[in-house]
Amino acid sequence: MALDPAEQHLRHVEKDVLIPKIIREKARERCSEQVEDFTRCCKDSGILMVLKCRKENSALKDCLTAYYNDPAFYEECKLEYLKEREEFRKTGVPTKKRLQKLPTNM
């Protein structure tokens, strides 16, 4: 039984694991300023980071939560996943492997 590359049905693991992974990665990219602020605060504060970095942690959580709860952002990530899956089903090559550069000394 061959899989149809253009099929839109999502399995449980795709809905609950793979698409949320894409959402987390893209949200971290879009909240990079808050991620950097929180990381810097943690590095500078050491053990006291729990107390000293509350403001940065709250800003980071607010930014990430806004993306996690945005239905349009979920659909954008879902379409990106479906496109990657369709390409994989056509070529058999995962996206990460396709993006790697070929050696130049061949």
Curated annotation (Swiss-Prot):
Keyword Nucleotidyltransferase: no
Residue ranges annotated for the CHCH domain, each copy included: 28-71
Acetylation among keywords: yes
PROSITE patterns: CHCH
Disulfide-bonded cysteines: C31-C63, C41-C53
Subcellular compartments: Mitochondrion
Motif (Cx9C motif 1): 31-41
Residue(s) carrying N-acetylalanine: A2
Gene Ontology CC, one term: mitochondrion
Motif (Cx9C motif 2): 53-63
InterPro entries: Cyt_c_biogenesis_Cmc1-like
Gene Ontology MF annotations: metal ion binding
Keyword field: Acetylation, Copper, Disulfide bond, Metal-binding, Mitochondrion
Chief location of this protein within or outside the cell: mitochondrion
Subunit structure: Component of the MITRAC (mitochondrial translation regulation assembly intermediate of cytochrome c oxidase complex) complex, the core components of this complex being COA3/MITRAC12 and COX14.
Task of the protein: Component of the MITRAC (mitochondrial translation regulation assembly intermediate of cytochrome c oxidase complex) complex, that regulates cytochrome c oxidase assembly.
Family stated for the protein in its record: Belongs to the CMC family.
Protein's name in the database: COX assembly mitochondrial protein homolog
